[in-house]
From Swiss-Prot, chain A:
<dbReference type="GO" id="GO:0016538">
    <property type="term" value="F:cyclin-dependent protein serine/threonine kinase regulator activity"/>
</dbReference>
<dbReference type="InterPro" id="IPR006671">
    <property type="entry name" value="Cyclin_N"/>
</dbReference>
<keyword id="KW-0805">Transcription regulation</keyword>
<keyword id="KW-0010">Activator</keyword>
<dbReference type="InterPro" id="IPR036915">
    <property type="entry name" value="Cyclin-like_sf"/>
</dbReference>
<comment type="similarity">
    <text>Belongs to the cyclin family. Cyclin C subfamily.</text>
</comment>
<dbReference type="InterPro" id="IPR043198">
    <property type="entry name" value="Cyclin/Ssn8"/>
</dbReference>
<keyword id="KW-0195">Cyclin</keyword>
<protein>
    <recommendedName>
        <fullName>RNA polymerase II holoenzyme cyclin-like subunit</fullName>
    </recommendedName>
</protein>
Curated annotation (Swiss-Prot), chain B:
<feature type="active site" description="Proton acceptor">
    <location>
        <position position="158"/>
    </location>
</feature>
<comment type="function">
    <text>Component of the srb8-11 complex. The srb8-11 complex is a regulatory module of the Mediator complex which is itself involved in regulation of basal and activated RNA polymerase II-dependent transcription. The srb8-11 complex may be involved in the transcriptional repression of a subset of genes regulated by Mediator. It may inhibit the association of the Mediator complex with RNA polymerase II to form the holoenzyme complex. The srb8-11 complex phosphorylates the C-terminal domain (CTD) of the largest subunit of RNA polymerase II.</text>
</comment>
<dbReference type="InterPro" id="IPR011009">
    <property type="entry name" value="Kinase-like_dom_sf"/>
</dbReference>
<keyword id="KW-0808">Transferase</keyword>
<comment type="similarity">
    <text>Belongs to the protein kinase superfamily. CMGC Ser/Thr protein kinase family. CDC2/CDKX subfamily.</text>
</comment>
<keyword id="KW-0418">Kinase</keyword>
<feature type="region of interest" description="Disordered">
    <location>
        <begin position="376"/>
        <end position="413"/>
    </location>
</feature>
<dbReference type="InterPro" id="IPR008271">
    <property type="entry name" value="Ser/Thr_kinase_AS"/>
</dbReference>
<keyword id="KW-0547">Nucleotide-binding</keyword>
Length: 301, 413
């Protein structure tokens, strides 16, 4: 069913275990060791940060909504579970994922406009000819087996807002945590409602005041590392007198819901490590490594 | 110039060559139909793959002689995505999708019949009504499929007899999801996407009135029209479509609205409070004023229409399996309810006395039927076979990339 996650192709075909994902990536490395040593690339999460920033650039002038960008990010992830990045032109993949996601999320953009906009940003990597993007669209759809409907945690978040009487600040923070989870493998590893619950916990436990997201996530990482122990303890000990009532209410709700708490904790840890590695992010570095790879392998042709 | 230097052992992952070829897997036996999207062919499975298939080919755009990738239309993308996701006994079954030679081939199960063809058969050589139990089974299965779509947050938006497929074992399959879309909190209002939906004869009054926020109720109106057509063998509201003008503004469908009013009476704010805020309300008022008082019935004449329809069809007068009877009328009137907020839902319709009373409903709509329907027409020549008298469904609003490309090219010349 299109709107039912449990029967969706996302749950049936696009949910991986960590081990499976690692195996897939290792098999890419095995198959083309030369390329891997010749063209080292930054950590996948740093690349994801880079891709997401490029998508935001692309989307800005076309005033694309966040959900279409999120869908595009999921498409990119899915595509790279089937293709070694070193055999592709990532700029073309990013642009095509954007173009396709806009159509799927009902905010379509004309192919010529998308190509023109992409050439504004990366003239040396995107050909003026729209047929390249059209061809890449075929590759993307084919690798995804036409399974293009993506379920996002945003929906669960808005459904839970009244139930958990979340403040607008908390919702805003949870929303940006959800935005950030697209920078990790989490969308390939956990169902959207688990992500939403994780985002809500993070938002309620760590007040929005502590955070200015995107780029300067370090304070949050620290806060989460230290404070995270509290919530993890609270989750384990339902009779604990420790946490404030606000958090106790959330813990109570969690205990009654059938949400997989262990999965929620794993997601939180994944996010903490994202914020830690984010400190090493350098746009220039990503750009250089990708550029060198694309140019010397003629992947832009 | 640089292409020669590409290492052939490492093809670019963004280039595209199909892993599966249509002709390797399927033997095309003939041509079924064509539309704005492309063509449908009948095919047989090859190499041990049994069965018959209908292959829908979305046409690649031709710019000059060489076919180019021009970006897929949003309608194709939607149909591919939704059909890959959906799985229900009363929704057409997708076998696979093959992307090859810059075209898309959607491989569906083959269905021998559709409601348009069945209705047509009952007018030849003279009119003879579709048996009441068959109508009931068709409608039940249709609503069952529609309930599944609606609970999956999918609006079909183009229900009409030609899109209701029937297998040779009498199972109903809702087909052609080219206009279908998800309606759970869409990013843009549903109106802004496609300005015109639903083939005009089956278009709900709120769409004719220019409604911007329409709901699954539009599909239920279409089911009402189909129900009426199954009984009378003619479209109940056979209006003439006013064409879109050069400015691409959607005209008020005056003639179609008139056809509805002639049977259903003038809609008033008493029976449909929301009507006064509809964009075309003033058009409706001027339509009412343009005729002599009493020209349009003040109240619904649907019951009269229904009774004479049963009489002409030779349906039994006393209640029983031989007639849709009073329950059938009640259901029809709830489907053809002006106010979309009051119109019966698929769920409610399935629990209606029309289905509850009168014994079991067969999952084979042909059960107990002695007659035989002709097979689907499959031709060997690949010519366009357009059913000229049938108005098509407009797939506008979302500029099909390929069409836009062509238009702008023409402009330059």
């Amino acid at each position: 069913m299109a709107a039912n996650y449990w029967a969706s192709t996302q749950r049936r075909h696009w949910l991986f275990t960590k081990e499976r994902l690692a195996d897939i990536r290792e098999s890419f490395r095995e198959r083309d060791k030369a390329a891997h040593s010749q063209f080292p690339l930054p950590d996948q999460r740093l690349l994801n940060i880079y891709f997401s920033q490029q998508l935001i650039k692309l989307g800005k002038r076309m005033s694309t909504r966040q959900q279409a960008l999120a869908t595009a990010q999921v498409y990119i992830k899915r595509f790279y579970t089937k293709n070694e990045i070193r055999h592709t032109n990532p700029y073309l993949v990013v642009t095509t994922a954007f173009y396709l996601a806009c159509k799927m999320e009902e905010c379509p953009q004309h192919i010529r406009f998308v190509v023109a906009e992409a050439r504004n940003f990366w003239p040396e990597f995107i050909a003026p000819d729209v047929s390249k993007l059209g061809e890449c669209e075929f590759a993307l759809i084919s690798e995804m087996n036409s399974q293009l409907i993506v379920h996002h945690p945003y929906r669960t978040l808005s459904e839970l807002q009244p139930e958990l009487s979340l403040t607008s600040d908390e919702v805003a923070l949870a929303w940006s945590v959800i935005n950030d989870h697209y920078l990790t493998d989490l969308p390939l590893l956990y169902p959207p409602h688990v992500i939403a619950v994780m985002a809500i916990i993070v938002a309620v436990v760590f007040k929005p005041s502590q955070t200015s997201f995107h780029g300067t996530a370090a304070p949050l990482a620290g806060a989460m590392r230290d404070g995270g122990m509290n919530i993890l303890a609270a989750l384990g000990d339902k009779n604990g007198a420790g946490p404030p009532p606000r958090i106790q209410k959330l813990v109570g709700w969690l205990a009654e819901s059938e949400v997989d708490i262990r999965a929620v904790i794993e997601c939180t840890q994944e996010l903490v490590s994202l914020y830690e590695i984010w400190e090493n992010y350098s746009e220039k570095h990503c750009k250089e490594l990708l550029g060198r790879m694309v140019k010397s392998k003629n992947l832009d042709k | 110039m640089l292409k020669e230097h590409l290492d052939p052992r490492k093809p670019s992952g963004t280039g595209y060559t199909s892993k599966v070829r249509v002709r390797d897997k399927y033997h095309i036996v003939g041509f079924i139909s064509s539309g704005t999207y492309g063509r449908v062919y009948k095919a047989l499975g090859k190499n041990g793959q049994k069965g018959e298939f209908a292959i829908k080919k979305f046409k690649p755009d031709k710019e000059g002689e060489i076919i180019q990738y021009t970006g897929l239309s949003q309608s194709a993308i939607r149909e591919m995505a939704l059909c890959s996701e959906l799985d229900h006994a009363n929704v057409v079954q997708l076998e696979e999708i093959i992307l090859e030679d810059k075209a898309i081939f959607m491989v569906f199960e083959y269905t021998e019949h559709d409601l348009l063809q069945i209705i047509h058969h009952h007018t030849q050589p003279h009119r003879h009504a579709i048996p009441a139990p068959m109508v009931r089974s068709i409608l039940f299965q249709l609503l069952n499929g529609l309930l599944y779509l609606h609970t999956s947050w999918v609006l079909h938006r183009d229900l009409k007899p030609a899109n209701i497929l029937v297998t040779s074992s009498g199972a109903i399959r809702i087909g052609d999801l080219g206009l279908a879309r998800l309606f759970y909190k869409p990013l843009n209002s549903l109106f802004s996407g496609d300005k015109v939906v639903v083939t005009i004869w089956y278009r709900a009054p709120e769409l004719l009135m220019g409604s911007r926020h329409y709901t699954p109720a539009v599909d239920l109106w279409a089911v009402g029209c189909i129900f009426a057509e199954l009984l009378s063998l003619r479209p109940i509201f056979k209006g003439e479509e006013a064409k879109m003008d050069s400015k691409k503004t959607v005209p008020f469908q005056r003639n179609q609205m008139m056809k509805i009013i002639e049977i259903m009476g003038l809609p008033t704010k008493d029976i449909w409070p929301g009507i006064v805020s509809m964009p075309e309300y003033s058009q409706l008022q001027s339509l009412a004023m343009s005729r002599a008082p009493g020209h349009f019935p003040r109240s619904s004449n649907l019951e009269g229409w229904y009774q004479s329809c049963l009489k002409n069809g030779g349906y039994a007068t006393s209640s029983g399996a031989g007639t849709p009877g009073a329950d059938g009328y009640d259901l029809l009137s709830r489907l053809l309810e002006y106010d979309p907020t009051k119109r019966i839902t698929a769920q409610e319709a399935l629990e209606h006395p029309y289905f509850k009373n009168g014994g079991p409903i067969s999952a084979n709509c042909f059960e107990g039927f002695e007659g035989k329907y002709p097979h689907r027409r499959v031709t060997q020549d690949d010519n366009d076979i357009r059913s000229g008298s049938l108005p098509g469904t407009k797939r506008s609003g979302l500029p099909d990339d390929s069409l836009m490309g062509r238009a702008s090219k023409r402009l330059k010349e």
